[in-house]
């Protein structure tokens, strides 16, 4: 895992959702629920070491989770 600062990760994640911070918050919330229910992280981060929102934001920043993947499950 590279060592991006939290601000850099947040900026990349925000860019992925067209700078819509409300959409980003929703996407993080939905992904945190999935991770909390036992979904495996899509990035190399241990759920026992890192907070679930940090993992979710990293996944979004790296393009591993997109809005359509959450919408399809509803």
Curated annotation (Swiss-Prot):
The keyword DNA-binding does not apply. It is an enzyme of class 2 (transferase). GO terms for cellular component: DNA-directed RNA polymerase complex. The keyword Transferase applies. One of its GO terms (molecular function) is DNA-directed RNA polymerase activity. Its EC number is 2.7.7.6. Transmembrane segments: none annotated. It catalyses: RNA(n) + a ribonucleoside 5'-triphosphate = RNA(n+1) + diphosphate. NCBIfam families: PRK00392.6-2. The RNAP catalytic core consists of 2 alpha, 1 beta/beta' and 1 omega subunit. When a sigma factor is associated with the core the holoenzyme is formed, which can initiate transcription. Belongs to the RNA polymerase subunit omega family. This is DNA-directed RNA polymerase subunit omega. It comes from Helicobacter hepaticus (strain ATCC 51449 / 3B1). The gene is rpoZ.
């Amino acid at each position: 895992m590279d060592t991006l600062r939290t601000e850099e990760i947040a900026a990349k994640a925000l860019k992925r959702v067209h700078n819509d911070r409300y959409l980003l918050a929703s996407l993080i919330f939905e992904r945190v629920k999935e991770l909390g229910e036992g979904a495996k992280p899509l990035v190399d981060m241990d759920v026992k070491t890192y907070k679930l929102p940090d993992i979710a934001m990293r996944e979004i920043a790296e393009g591993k989770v997109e809005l359509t993947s959450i919408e399809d499950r509803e």
